């Protein structure tokens, strides 16, 4: 079981709700994935409609909602968005996202740290999206974030685990869960992150933009489970030279 804040999760695959062609397909894909936590932008939710097309299928399936602060350009905007989400959705969980550059959507480390400090003081369970920066992730942990969410590659790029070396350091030194977020474009990418020791991954575009999102969701579920199983089993170490699996020297000497 994965514990973050006051919740426990059987599934280590977290999902997003954007880019699906319709809410029914979104709900089916998330349900098939086994995900128990789905992130969503507050701007996509009609907080005055209790039968909101996005919310209801997820709530009915028992999926926990993780509102994000997507669109915030600074700490002040992010704190305000989080407060709105808490009031509208009744949750103190928030995925902290601050990316002022609309082209590359790179997270602002300075504003993210400032917002995280304020939100933790205000009683939020904060999961910050950030660069794969070991120093920053440690600082976010120290100010009280419940987990850290370093990027694998730019949002929506599907480039996979481009920040591998830095993620290894983050995972090694973290005392809170590490959720690899952004850039995961194939089930193999998710498996690789889990094999490294990541506690979970968050996937959106790779599922939502697939030709068959439901089938892809199942593929990601299996990849995350197998990657976690491999990590726990203990991967064989790498060496720089060949090591025969069936040495023949003694056998040949006897001929």
Curated annotation (Swiss-Prot):
InterPro entries: Aldolase_TIM, Thiazole_synthase_ThiG, ThiG. Disulfide bonds: none annotated. One of its GO terms (cellular component) is cytoplasm. It is an enzyme of class 2 (transferase). The keyword Cytoplasm applies. It comes from the Bacteria. One of its GO terms (biological process) is thiamine diphosphate biosynthetic process. Pathway: Cofactor biosynthesis; thiamine diphosphate biosynthesis. CDD domains: ThiG. Signal peptide: none annotated. Coiled coil: none annotated. It is found in: Cytoplasm. Homotetramer. Forms heterodimers with either ThiH or ThiS. Belongs to the ThiG family. This is Thiazole synthase.
